[in-house]
Amino acid sequence: MTAADPTASVASPSSAQPAIRVYNTLSKTKEPFLPLRAPRVGMYLCGPTVYAESHIGHMVGPVIFDTIKRYLTYSGYEVTWVVNITDVDDKLIGKSKERGIPMSQIAVEMTADYLANLRELGVNQIDHLPRATDHMPQIIAFIGSLESKGFAYAIDGDVFFDVTKDPGYGQLSNRSVEDQQGEGGGAAAKKRNPGDFALWKSARPGEPFWDSPWGEGRPGWHIECSAMSHEILGETFDIHGGGLDLMFPHHENERAQSTCCHGAPMVKYWMHNGLMRAGEKGKVGGKSDRENAAAEAASVEEQASGKISRSKGAGGLADLIRSQTGERIRFFLLRTQYRSTIVYNEETLAEAGTSLEAFYRYFDRFAEITGDSFYDLSAATRRADGGFDPAGDALLTEIHAIREKFLAAMDDDFNTGAAISVLFDALRTLNRHIDANQLAAGADAKSPAVESLVKATSVIAELSRVLGLFAKPPATSGGDEADAELLDSVVHLLINLRKEARERKDYATGDAIRDRLADLGVALLDKKEGTSWERKS
């Protein structure tokens, strides 16, 4: 079913909102960013299947879309960002059998690990983290609607989507239905067409299940995202993000389900980030237009062939954060334009660390001259508030031009690699100003040279915070204070997950969290005003 596009007649952005352009995977072009209901923006990112600890590849999408939300908010939009958690899946069931513990317990543990790692990388803009198991009524209703409209069919307790009923199937990925023929697991022989995919899977002995009109079972992977995005963002929303490897079959199937169910496009802008590749040396950072064009043309197979994954031994993210710091990893991920492949090895990560140190040295130098901390500077939090008149001041004239160049880079499909290169231009300009005016500790705070320096540096604070960088002094790797802060954060995440489990009467999971923490030397204290924790002696 191909529906009329409700996005065809939308209001132009107000004069306060800039001319941002976004690369849309569906159209294969950069398009003006015109939200459906400006200034409100709905954004959905496919999150993890929480069956094992996170690795660095899982952080690529969240860091990118956290930055995109920051920039859209800075540009005057009101963004609602959703990241789903897949907590029922074949991999989770397999891990449950392997470890001999409930699937829900594994999901709680690994969700806490994922969220703790996001926090360390400064990903704090997520508004909703829906879990599939909390949305079974919505998922079942969604499947029922597809069946009643003739887009799905049930056979022996399994429900499949009929891809032949959607003439638009394959437009997102340029794939044919024949490419989908492996989907369906052990029930694949029941399908009417090789390309049909599972919406509901009948229960097998020893596996978790939910009651449904088709009997006991559990949802397929693709339907979870369609149901949860619809529940929170509505029938059609602005941005759907995810890794390039999810374009097919996952996003293609999501799009088919939602479009057919609602008779309207699911998403206006499909955005796909490049994947992370390990073990190669190569250039990272702001790329030329030619390099970016080549990255756009790279196929899914080319990027996925070297993709970092658990199966290839990736892991140890908590240890990596401990040794490198979350800010260094975030900086490393943002140095590359988001649609490009990120080359990950010791050399490229070390290069990012060296680059970051140049900023830290400047912040120390600034503090020595002015007596002020860079991290305490007052800076504009909205684009419309950050403009200024250089009034003939040489330094401010340069910084004003640099700010415009930074904004142009971000307006051009959120090119963080180019934006970071512009910040390096600013750094060189500021250091030249200090050297030319021989500024040092004890300089007169009211001198024109120092006043210009403070104003110019506040602009750098404004722009870097848009990228989620330099909001607070750098953490030292392995420091006791950082460890204590991380421990408190993780325990409170588990306390909240335990509370939610008990509220839905999943007492086994709640007790498992308490007991596992006790094994690790953490005692939970339940009181009328809430739950706190302490180390066991």
UniProtKB/Swiss-Prot annotation:
Primary subcellular site in the record, as a coarse category? cytoplasm
Q: Which reaction does it catalyse?
A: tRNA(Cys) + L-cysteine + ATP = L-cysteinyl-tRNA(Cys) + AMP + diphosphate
* Any one GO MF annotation of this record: ATP binding
Listed under GO cellular component are: cytoplasm; cytosol
Please give the Pfam families that the UniProt record associates with this protein.
CysS_C, DALR_2, tRNA-synt_1e
Residues involved in Zn(2+) binding: 46, 225, 250, 254
Cross-referenced InterPro entries: Cys-tRNA-ligase, Cys-tRNA-synt_Ia_DALR, Cys-tRNA/MSH_ligase, CysS_C, Rossmann-like_a/b/a_fold, tRNA-synt_1_cat_dom, tRNAsynth_Ia_anticodon-bd
The protein's required cofactors:
Zn(2+)
Gene3D superfamilies documented for this protein = Cysteine-tRNA ligase, C-terminal anti-codon recognition domain, HUPs
UniProt GO BP = cysteinyl-tRNA aminoacylation
Which keywords appear in this protein's UniProt record, sorted alphabetically? Answer: Aminoacyl-tRNA synthetase, ATP-binding, Cytoplasm, Ligase, Metal-binding, Nucleotide-binding, Protein biosynthesis, Zinc
Judging by the UniProt lineage, the source's domain of life is Bacteria
The residue numbers the entry assigns to motif 'HIGH' region are: 48-58
Q: How is the cofactor bound here?
A: Binds 1 zinc ion per subunit.
EC no. given is 6.1.1.16
Subunit and interaction comment: Monomer.
- HAMAP family membership: Cys_tRNA_synth
Q: What is this protein called?
A: Cysteine--tRNA ligase
Taxonomic source organism: Rhodopirellula baltica (strain DSM 10527 / NCIMB 13988 / SH1)
What is the taxonomic lineage of the source species? Bacteria, Pseudomonadati, Planctomycetota, Planctomycetia, Pirellulales
